């Protein structure tokens, strides 16, 4: 009896395993990084969209800077950032009400197994490009190969991790992956799908304004004036208007992007009624500069949109490729000398919250004090290479808010001296006698950073350091920062609730040499790369959170950026005719919010 029993149990176990595998590899309507998608297969609309929103109207957005290209898929030229999201479509679409979950879009279904070493998509039979031609598996395969080899560098990393890409049926395409990385099954769902036939005789890599890539998206570019405006029209024949992911979105008939030289001109254009909305980043201005007639009479509405996103990092990045910034003590001294509390009071009446770490304001944020538990276990193998404070705990230097900032200036002086920079004849010099000079690179129109630098310059003067600013137009600024040709520069890196492979583009050591990455600081930290590997390979939410918190410690204690302020809300002023749903997404005012789920309601 014993023998039969164990065989029977074995057979039951084997069939249970088989069933589990079959269940895991059934076509699904969505995929989440951890757990299951929140929405059922027959969902009516995204929870933060209004399925009954009326269609019609025009929204005008005032943008800073200029543009030299309308092809966001290549490195050449500067492109309006919205085009990637409004004018192109991918196999899956992202819900901004969950940390990282995708739902079917150009794909009708998605299949993968427990290991996620492969993923298979079935194309939606109705999917059409704006010219009416069907979206085919051939278009999908061509798009991945082209973007992964000659497209923008942001696409190259994923392409290297795809082992095979094959057509498995008339409307089916399968990817297998070369690496164990649970995020890849989601990432392949997010690449733009382009029309192969359009590019058979055209030069994709060098296209700019001459050829506008055809797509399957709800909006098509109707006309443009280089550097001045782009006009997008809603495609009345858009194939996907009735699928759950799209219902209640893309409600405006026309979206117009107007370009202005700087922020103050953008604001004046908004006040004059030339644009529909204005995103106010300065808390003091929000309080004191919105008393003009249109606000008083109710023509313009002030909306506050909360969010649960990490703060990301905003501030002034130090380029550690330059020997003067290589020593962490120098960077700590420069952070201490930046009197944030006084500057915040002078610029915003003290209304802005300071960024305390890269993932602050979120569940991914490092905790105060020494590293514990799983976070400590992850960091310990790298203890020898970590910056002081990574394991023990690190806090930004704080001032008492007075203009003199005496305590921090004294601390900065001591740190600089320890690092070999001493005062000789009133100037801070190294052992070779070279003076400590810093040039800060700013973008034209960035008046807020300029006023911060005016105060900072005086503080550094007391330490014997000379600081000058150089102001570049947006094209020069992009050119210089892409090749890391600066001492210190204004830096902004938004971070999401689902950090993964893109973190290598931000902090990976290949960015030391490779132009065009976000690693402006010149990080070379094996510990950071190891935490990124853990982020993408962790199969439990607990391990993922621990890896994010460990990465946050490494970045923050690295002292690469002088952080300034963040906000856990967005401040949007807009004309009263444009409305948004009461139910807000977890990510708040982010990609997928304005204009995506707003609508126009005539008075």
Residue ranges and their predicted role:
Residues 27, 45-46, 65-82, 106, ...:
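A structural "hinge/loop" feature
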Residues 28-30, 63-65, 79, 86, ...:
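Detector for C-terminal structural segments
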Residues 25-115, 122, 142-145, 214:
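N-terminal lobe/hinge region of extracytoplasmic solute-binding protein
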